[in-house]
Amino acid sequence: MIPGEMKIDAGEILLNDGRETVTLEVANTGDRPIQVGSHYHFYETNEALSFERQLAYGFRLDIAAGTAVRFEPGQSRTVQLVALSGKREVYGFAGKVMGALK
């Protein structure tokens, strides 16, 4: 095996199938690029990202693990978020939750 190589069965791979999602329009109002990783609690992202923040509570980007989305200054884009799963406890990030999601 080559480092980073993936061997998978043929066919379609479904990520986060059947999980609750929300779609938001997000704009970078700052003067620096902002990159958000796949498992970052989107509600707690940089304040320069303008969007309906309360709708992102308990959600992360609906993208493959280990990837990210970059928002250039002045850029707006539509993103799909997926509900966090497991224990639904959030610690760290920007420190806005620090416990169980409500």
From Swiss-Prot:
GO biological process, one term: urea catabolic process
Summary of subunit composition and partner proteins: Heterotrimer of UreA (gamma), UreB (beta) and UreC (alpha) subunits. Three heterotrimers associate to form the active enzyme.
Sequence similarity: Belongs to the urease beta subunit family.
Pfam families, alphabetized: Urease_beta (PF00699)
Signal sequence extent: none
Domain of life: Bacteria
Top EC class, one word: hydrolase
Protein name: Urease subunit beta
EC assignment: 3.5.1.5
Cellular component annotations (GO), alphabetically ordered: urease complex
InterPro entries for this protein: Urease_beta-like, Urease_betasu_sf, Urease_subunit
Keywords assigned by UniProt, alphabetized: Cytoplasm, Hydrolase
HAMAP family: Urease_beta
Cell location: Cytoplasm
UniProt gene name: ureB
Cross-referenced CDD domains: Urease_beta (cd00407)
Pathways per UniProt: Nitrogen metabolism; urea degradation; CO(2) and NH(3) from urea (urease route): step 1/1
Catalytic activity: urea + 2 H2O + H(+) = hydrogencarbonate + 2 NH4(+)
KW Hydrolase (keyword) present: yes
Molecular-function GO term, any one: urease activity
